[in-house]
Amino acid sequence: MLEIVYQDEYLVAVNKPAGMLVHRSWLDKHETEFVMQTLRDQIGQHVFPLHRLDRPTSGVLVFALSSQIASEVMPMFANHEMEKTYHAIVRGWIEEANVLDYPLKEELDKIADKFAKQDKEAQSAVTAYRPLAKVELPIATGKFATTRYCLMEMQPKTGRKHQLRRHMAHLRHPIVGDTTHGDGVHNRLFREHFSAQRLMLHASELRFMHPYTQQPLVIRAGLDEVWQGLLSEFGWQESLLINA
């Protein structure tokens, strides 16, 4: 059963669990559970995704309730006429808010993009970010006697594939749990010490003008047990007041 965080006659939004594919994909031919099919069965009607959320990322995911609504609303999402807010735990301490303007080359999949042009120019990619809290743990990693982590709030201003994960890695502050762009030592530390098996990236909030009511709409998704446990462990509850 998916948690529905918003629904009206046009749109429905869920809190996507980490690790769940949005729809059937060649990425995992053996997977049997998908957000689209689960939500369709749950509400008894077809749904049409308006944007994407990577498999390991949790949080707000919005669907249209008809193909016509999807065709009318999708340009708004494609043109980034909304404000997305994510939260993440990253390696190291970031001391101040900033905006990273760092172009990214398109990441191509070996199978799905086999015939795509391989030498495309990097595309504009902009991310606003700010640190919310820090922690220093008495756990040695490499030559360091302690390890430092930071709770981050991020707002992507463009929509490149894996943008937040790649931008944080570029800053040398990879997101914990990122098996592609992250740091295996710290991913393993979180698995072994905190039973955190997931990517610590959550799509917390989506703000946009409702395409039919023309009223501002704010959709929020709460944090799962892994996130809640880490906030408690690190004393970060007051830094990130999102309802579970």
Curated annotation (Swiss-Prot):
Catalytic residue list: 54
Enzyme Commission (EC) number: 5.4.99.26
Reaction equation(s) it catalyzes: uridine(65) in tRNA = pseudouridine(65) in tRNA
Pfam family, one: PseudoU_synth_2
Gene Ontology biological process terms from the UniProt entry: enzyme-directed rRNA pseudouridine synthesis; tRNA processing
InterPro entries listed in its UniProt record: PsdUridine_synth_cat_dom_sf, PsdUridine_synth_RluA-like_CS, PsdUridine_synth_RsuA/RluA, RluA_PseudoU_synthase
GO molecular function: pseudouridine synthase activity; RNA binding; tRNA pseudouridine(65) synthase activity
Keyword annotations of the record: Isomerase, tRNA processing
Residue ranges of the TM segments: none
Family stated for the protein in its record: Belongs to the pseudouridine synthase RluA family.
Role: Responsible for synthesis of pseudouridine from uracil-65 in transfer RNAs.
Protein name per Swiss-Prot or TrEMBL: tRNA pseudouridine synthase C
Lineage: Bacteria, Pseudomonadati, Pseudomonadota, Gammaproteobacteria, Vibrionales
Name of the gene this protein is made from: truC
